[in-house]
Amino acid sequence: MAMYTSIMLMTLASLALPIFATLVNPNKTHSYPNYVKTTMMYAFITSLIPTTLYIFSNQETTIWSWHWMMTQTLDLTLSFKLDYFSMMFIPIALFITWSIMEFSLWYMSSDPNINQFFKYLLIFLITMLILITANNLFQLFIGWEGVGIMSFLLISWWHARTDANTAAIQAVLYNRIGDIGLILAMVWFLLHYNSWDFQQMLALNPHPSPLPLMGLLLAAVGKSAQFGLHPWLPSAMEGPTPVSALLHSSTMVVAGVFLLIRFHPLMENDTLTQNLTLCLGAITTLFMAMCALTQNDIKKIVAFSTSSQLGLMMITIGINQPYLAFLHICTHAFFKAMLFICSGSIIHNLNNEQDIRKMGGLFKTMPLTSTSLIIGNLALTGIPFLTGFYSKDLIIEATSTSYTNAWALSITLIATSLTSAYSTRTILLTLTGQPRFPTLTNINENNPALLNPIKRLTTASMITGFLITNNIPPTSLPQPTMPLHLKLLALYMTALGFIITLDLTLMTNKLKVKTPPQTFKFSNMLGYFPTIAHRMIPHQNLLMSQNLALLLLDSMWLEKSMPKMISQTHITASTTVTAQKSMIKLYFLSFLIPLALALLLMV
């Protein structure tokens, strides 16, 4: 045990060496990106040793290394929890980051600040590993906020673009809403448990009130872009493609789901939280699959598929299967990173063209990228014996045999069919048919920095599902039994999506352009959610503020107090003055007549 903990700590510490190197020698060197990439490769190879030892020993451990601060009721320590989740996730995160960094050497080669870009990617990974290995809420919160800050810096990397800056601010604002829930949960645990250590919280009261669990759920909804707080995820595609690949595969977006997995022992007996998680995940997976079906931006299609798969993970947590949700996190990371790298390869070769309607015929000009894109999409749909099959098929089986909610099952099956539909649409429009891009486009996929990551991730997308499922520690749950037609239900829905999409694509190839129906607009406009939240509500607030300012400032203050008040004062004075007609003789005469009459009466 001491051996594999020491090796794992050494692996994590080695990741900080490139950052310290920039502090010692801040001068820009051309070899720094290669140095970071090589460090990542060695860290991955080293991390395989403790992971292998853990799989054979199945003994988790906690490392208490440093007491940071003590108060009367709270002891804050730096401690690492090396259990099944962290030991399995660390090599996966390192492998994917290594591949993405090698891809970045090709994709970002012309960027003048490539050294800083690699440094940001490395810090992004380190903060995620801090979150994964945290043994207390304080350390988890540091990693939680770290991935949020780094996502802001990386999404807005091309800060000369207005859309990139807007997308980065949008990501931060939506994550702030989720952070409120995490902070409320931390305050509640501190007040009621006087501790932020996971072991003590579970030992003191495994059945807390729903309030902190609602806070944790809100945090997960914000970070993992569930329905309601989802618009930031497709907007984050404004960042460079390596950022999108790292953000969506093994770092920020899975942090919310991982938070619920880590706190699942507190949630498993709370039916309200479980049902909310289940229903929210079901709505998210269906809505995002619907949105992906009508998008034309290749990166946004992959982004919506990520959000749909995150909804599937939430469904799994909602039916009390945290290990299955974690398995889907691990398998999903490989083919999602590969899909983004293949998309980046196509975009880069087509001179930054992202519209799939302007592609086509790429299978002959980019054979390796095309093959990997097909394998990645097939793994995403859950085709048997690819990586995605081992987790996605199990999730649908677990949902089918769950007594919780038949409505969630039906929505999950529809979303599964839609997943195969938009994956097939992407393959057909991007790779097949006649080329629809300019003929002078120079396509070249011979760079080793592009080919090696794609080959590695393609291989991983085919075999890692089998390897991981064979190394899950045994649980006490009985093996579910089900009829054959229920066992093949997921495959039926996937095949249905393939067939419908193929038929629709062949049928619509030669149709005239018509006005799209309202259902198409609803899906294409993302359910009008961004229009209402980002346009209509701010417009109404601005209009109301303008009217209020007009009434208070212009109409009342400026007019009533200054110009109109002066004129009104002068009008009143002039009216008083002009009421006297200057008929002094008539006035004296009218005074003398009654006086004369009085004198006559007295005589």
From Swiss-Prot:
InterPro entries according to UniProt: NADH_DH_su5_C, NADHpl_OxRdtase_5_subgr, ND/Mrp_TM, NU5C-like, Proton_antipo_N
Pfam families linked to this entry: NADH5_C (PF06455), Proton_antipo_M (PF00361), Proton_antipo_N (PF00662)
Subcellular location: Mitochondrion inner membrane
GO biological processes: electron transport coupled proton transport; mitochondrial electron transport, NADH to ubiquinone; mitochondrial respiratory chain complex I assembly
Protein name from the UniProt record: NADH-ubiquinone oxidoreductase chain 5
Gene Ontology, cellular component aspect: mitochondrial inner membrane
Swiss-Prot/TrEMBL catalytic activity: a ubiquinone + NADH + 5 H(+)(in) = a ubiquinol + NAD(+) + 4 H(+)(out)
Organism: Papio hamadryas (Hamadryas baboon)
Assembly and oligomerization: Core subunit of respiratory chain NADH dehydrogenase (Complex I) which is composed of 45 different subunits.
UniProt keywords, alphabetically: Electron transport, Membrane, Mitochondrion, Mitochondrion inner membrane, NAD, Respiratory chain, Translocase, Transmembrane, Transmembrane helix, Transport, Ubiquinone
Gene name tied to this protein: MT-ND5
PANTHER family associated with the record: NADH-UBIQUINONE OXIDOREDUCTASE CHAIN 5
